[in-house]
């Protein structure tokens, strides 16, 4: 099992890092009481599961439990349990600025100034920083740059992709998918719903595919969409985007949109730069309601 303790200064980006590690396939537990860390590891050794990577967030919100860290880590070493420590840090003035921008108080400051809380926190976390395997200073990092730094350290799973693309067909009559990044409307194409013998079929059937793709507009559309998506993919990856939902809609989500979604899926398949899947959201909806 890959076991990572994620810690660091409040305001340095620990919560953001935990979310990114979750995207990398880690099972994440934030703000775990120190007293439960040893028990969590015992449980992970007792039960066989599909969880192979765990990230545990620990910070000064643990209160007095943070003082037990040296003893707890020593117990892990005695059990020969492998773990790594990631420590996120930032310059004091940057931390103060971030707190002021969010109008939050430092967890150790109480009624004192933020600077006082930062000093106390550094004292409490010094042992973890001294024993950290990786230290990332986020003072000058953008969110996407932090993601890149984490990927350099932790991405070892060949199944993980920087970008995962979902191609989604849908019917406008049932609403545009709320998680869409790109929405394409293919209602400009002739509708097989009104062709005898085709109404009951779907875009997964060859008869519908042949009907839709016989029109030059359909082929020109998919050519241009394919070119646009292939242009966007490397730019999205460089900006740190990890999910892309391309929604293709017609009236009912059964014929035209399914056909074009399948065509795009075929064209984007076979590339190792991203993950890819296809969904037909409304293909099973009541055909009698129109297409």
UniProtKB/Swiss-Prot annotation:
**Which Gene3D superfamilies would you find in this protein's record?**
P-loop containing nucleotide triphosphate hydrolases
Residue sites binding GTP per the record: 59-62
Domain of life of the organism in this record? Bacteria
Keyword GTP-binding listed: yes
* Binding-site list for ATP: 8-15
Q: Which UniProt keywords apply?
A: ATP-binding, GTP-binding, Nucleotide-binding
- One annotated GO molecular function: ATP binding
Among InterPro entries, the record links this protein to: P-loop_NTPase, RapZ-like, RapZ-like_N, RapZ_C
- One Pfam match: RapZ-like_N
Q: Which SUPFAM superfamilies match?
A: P-loop containing nucleoside triphosphate hydrolases (SSF52540)
- State its role: Displays ATPase and GTPase activities.
According to its UniProt record, which protein family does this protein belong to? Belongs to the RapZ-like family.
Full protein name: Nucleotide-binding protein EUBREC_0697
Lineage of the native species? Bacteria, Bacillati, Bacillota, Clostridia, Lachnospirales
């Amino acid at each position: 099992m890959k076991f990572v303790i994620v810690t660091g200064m409040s305001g340095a980006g620990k919560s953001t890092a935990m979310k990114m590690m979750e995207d990398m396939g880690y099972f994440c537990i934030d703000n775990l009481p120190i007293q439960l860390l040893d028990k969590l590891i015992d449980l992970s050794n007792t039960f066989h599961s599909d969880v192979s990577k765990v990230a545990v967030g620990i910070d000064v919100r643990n209160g007095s439990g943070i003082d037990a860290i040296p003893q707890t880590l020593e117990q892990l070493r005695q059990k020969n349990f492998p773990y790594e420590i990631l420590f996120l840090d930032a310059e004091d003035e940057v931390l103060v600025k971030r707190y002021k921008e969010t109008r939050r108080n430092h967890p150790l400051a109480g009624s004192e100034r933020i600077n006082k809380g930062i000093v106390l926190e550094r004292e409490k976390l010094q042992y973890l920083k001294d024993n950290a395997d990786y230290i990332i200073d986020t003072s000058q990092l953008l969110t996407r740059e932090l993601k890149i730094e984490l990927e350099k350290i932790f991405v070892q799973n060949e199944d993980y992709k920087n970008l995962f693309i979902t191609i989604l067909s849908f019917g406008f009559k049932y609403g545009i998918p709320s998680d869409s990044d790109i929405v394409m409307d293919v209602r400009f194409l002739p509708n097989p719903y009104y062709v005898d013998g085709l109404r009951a079929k779907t875009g997964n059937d060859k008869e519908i595919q042949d009907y839709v793709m016989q029109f030059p507009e359909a082929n020109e559309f998919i050519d241009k969409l394919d070119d646009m998506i292939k242009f966007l993919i490397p730019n999205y990856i460089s900006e740190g985007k990890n999910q892309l939902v391309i929604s293709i809609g017609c009236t009912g989500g059964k014929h035209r949109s399914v056909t074009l979604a399948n065509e795009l899926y075929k064209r984007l398949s076979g590339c190792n730069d991203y993950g890819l899947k296809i969904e037909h959201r409304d293909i099973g909806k009541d055909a009698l309601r129109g297409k």
